[in-house]
A protein has these predicted regions:
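Short, flexible helix/strand-to-coil boundary loops that buttress conserved ligand/catalytic motifs
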Residues: 22, 156, 198, 225, ...
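Conserved catalytic network of the ASCE P-loop NTPase/AAA+ motor domain
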Residues: 26-28, 56-59, 134-138, 170-180, ...
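Amphipathic alpha-helical "lid/sensor" segments that cap RecA-like P-loop NTPase cores
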Residues: 223-295
């Protein structure tokens, strides 16, 4: 259950529009793969979790979410294979329990028989066959959502997994009278790296396009300001315009805005000085970000 004190800003219309696009139900068809790029910490992953995934589920799809940043030290291909295995386990919970109870781990459908623990493993069942099995067994479309997909490029196995997803997409969606059985969504906080999945004839998703994820705007800050001010004394409240200006200066990053507002809210000043402090703190944090970015840039090798 959601804490009533927790601020949530739903973006259901955006979620519906993007799901329409990846389903092929929009004039802006992106059924070949939806690639969303946005700077880190701008609300992209939160949007996936609270808006886009529920939209897929409301339409009856099985959602497989893989966050390649959740464990940077693990092989990206294994994270993807593990998520697919988990989805199959959930759909086959009863059957697997019976099979393993009698010492078996193989099962199949549509002419495909495999060992669950070998999905995506060299010499084991391919991701294509595993996803095909999941669709045939459940009769439900599949939404495969890869968050921070650019990390797949860090290894050859990760790149191969991207090609496997593309092959699965082609196998499931061809000759289906426009029925999209496998919907693929890829997000990334590094647009240039994400583009390496779509630009060039040798890339896994050649021909797909990168879409800029719409950043939060004044509607978000106005709603958040109202939510925050309800919990503050009348003579110690934030000005909506000042909050948006700070938010914009911070690169439209919700968590950074909350940090700055928290510092200001606990200051001893009243509304006028508090809003001035808000601008000062946001500007200082922005300078700090730029300084860190400049230091990181100078530390890179020329090829990087």
């Amino acid at each position: 259950m959601t804490d009533p004190k927790q601020f949530i800003f739903p973006r259901k219309k955006l979620a519906a529009d993007l799901v329409d696009a990846v389903c092929g139900a929009s004039p802006f068809d992106q059924s070949s793969g939806l690639f969303l790029a946005a700077p880190r910490r701008t609300g992209k992953s939160t949007f996936l979790r609270l808006d886009m995934i529920p939209e897929f589920e409301n339409r009856g799809a099985i959602v497989i979410l893989v966050d390649l940043w959740s464990d940077p030290d693990r092989e990206p291909a294994e994270l993807i294979a593990e998520a697919v295995r988990d989805a199959i386990r959930k759909s086959e919970a009863g059957i697997i329990k019976v099979l393993r109870g009698i010492g078996l781990s193989k099962f199949g459908a549509g002419g495909v028989s495999f060992e669950l623990d070998k999905v995506g493993v060299v010499g084991g069942i391919t991701l294509t066959d595993a996803l095909q099995y999941l669709y045939e067994k459940t009769g439900r479309s599949i939404a495969l959502v890869i968050d921070e997909a650019q990390h797949a490029l860090n290894s050859q196995a990760g790149i191969n997994a991207m090609f496997a997803i593309k092959a699965a997409r082609d196998a499931l969606n061809q000759n289906t009278a426009r029925e999209i059985r496998l919907m693929a969504v890829f997000t990334g906080s590094n647009r240039d790296k994400l583009s390496n999945l779509v630009l060039g004839r040798t890339t896994p998703f050649y021909g797909a396009m990168i879409t800029s994820f719409p950043l939060l705007d004044r509607k978000f800050t106005d709603a958040f300001t109202a939510h925050t001010n309800e919990r503050l004394a009348e003579d110690n409240r934030f000005d909506p315009a000042s909050v948006f200006a700070a938010f914009d200066a911070l690169g439209r990053r919700p968590e950074e805005l909350k940090k700055v507002l928290t510092v200001c809210a606990f200051s001893e000043g009243k509304a006028a000085s508090m809003n001035a402090l808000l601008a000062q703190n946001a500007a200082a944090l922005r300078v700090d970000y730029l300084s860190k970015f400049d230091g990181l840039f100078k530390s890179l090798d020329p090829l990087e």
